[in-house]
Amino acid sequence: MCIRDSTSGFPNLLIFSLQQSGFTVNFPHALDEQSKHAAYILRHVLDHDVRTFEVTQAAEDAWVETILELAQFNLDFLESCTPGYYNNEGKPSARGVRNGFYGGGSVQFFQVIADWRAKGDLPGLELLTG
């Protein structure tokens, strides 16, 4: 499931960001993948006369849990590297971990969003028609 580009309580919102997504030094590639994802969602809602779409709280919570689980792979690195901006001066915070990158890397993240689209029914989004 991938609901990282929306947030509960903000209908019809799509977010393009590095937070909770696959970090890559080739930023245009990340934008391209996120654009494909957004275009798929928008095409679906237009084709199905959806008036509003919004991520469910349960789906958002599940995605944040995924981010936190995968962040553990990076936590040792953040705690042991030279203090600086990216590790809160050597003290990684829960907020920083939650708002970090998808811990499986960009290739895995792009596959996750492709697999989500392949399901075809926008799981985790509440769709209101009319």
Each model region followed by its residue ranges:
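Short, small-residue-biased leader/transition segments that mark boundaries at the very start
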Residues: 1-3
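A structural motif
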Residues: 5-15
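C-terminal, flexible cofactor-proximal segment of oxidoreductases
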Residues: 14-130
